[in-house]
Amino acid sequence: MSNQYEVLGKAPVAEDLKTLSPNDVHLTIKNLNAGYGKMEILHNFELFVSKAQSLCLIGPNGAGKSTILHSIYGFTNIFNGKIEIDGKEITKLSPAEKLKSVGIAYILQDNSVFPDMTVEENLLMGGFIKDKTEDSFEEAEKILQKYDRLGNRRNQLAKFYLVEKEGY
């Protein structure tokens, strides 16, 4: 933990970031220049995140937080650099290929569910972007088994889960 506090108070450089995630790096972003259209937003951005490490992107509006995430998921133009998950380069993969290849997907900030479908049906909807939709049943079941709160509500309409979750 002490090395985390050493980088506070200054803009960390790549070597500082590597000390925060010395073991089993899961996400690597190296020398990333990315943006929208011809406008470059990120300049030589670097990030290293270990497995089981939490990360919080903090900064003012326009600092590039969303652009970092959009770049990981393939929603920006990548002018230079690379993005890797577990050592596999994903920079040029489409969002669907990223989901299939390394299991990452972009979930919108709002409650992006179908409220009149069950929790399980909402999970199954994600399977339609896969090549083999029959795999979606297995994947949904894994999620329902892993997260008791969802599993216990698998046949409940999602709108009721949202009401409970959001406290409405």
Say what each PLM segment does.
Residues M1-N33:
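ABC-family P-loop ATPase nucleotide-binding domain
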Residues I29-L32, E40-Q53, G81:
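Conserved beta-strand
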Residues G37, M117-E138, K146-G151, N155:
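ABC-type ATPase nucleotide-binding domains, specifically the catalytic core motifs of the NBD
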Residues I58-P60:
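The feature captures the beta-strand-to-loop junction immediately N-terminal to the Walker
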Residues Y73:
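Helix-to-loop junction immediately C-terminal to a conserved catalytic motif
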Residues N77, E89-D110, T133-E134, N152-A158, ...:
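ABC ATPase NBD coupling module
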Residues K82-E84, K88:
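ATP-binding/catalytic-site motifs of ATP-hydrolyzing domains
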Residues L108-S112, M117, Y147, K165:
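ABC ATPase nucleotide-binding domain signature
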